[in-house]
Amino acid sequence: MTKAEEFDKARRLAYKGDFSLVEKLYHPDCKHFDHRVGLEVNLDMQSALMTAYENTTFGPYRVIYENEDFLCIQRYGRNRLTREILYMTLISGVNYRDEKIVRHETAIEYLDYDPSEGQEWNWDDYE
């Protein structure tokens, strides 16, 4: 499995409350800057913040760059928590040391369109 595949799978499981792969992939001293709260957080706090995505469906991902030490990945999300469906794109930079994630930062941009429209994928494929 590539770093991108592992990262995507770990995040999808964690958003559903299963942190087994996160615990395997992330270094215990991993740091994550969370833009929602404006703080650098540790792995325990990051895991708690991941529950904010429980109503979000994540679509396909695209690797921007990947090597032994770094992964840059772009993903789409759809959140149905509100009356109006929110669409977003997320770009994550992930640093590795000794094959473990030691730093992770994600920037989110909300979209005014459904990124699945006109594409060869749909949200139902990722529910």
Predicted regions mapped to residue ranges:
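C-terminal and inter-domain tail/linker signature
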Residues: M1-E127
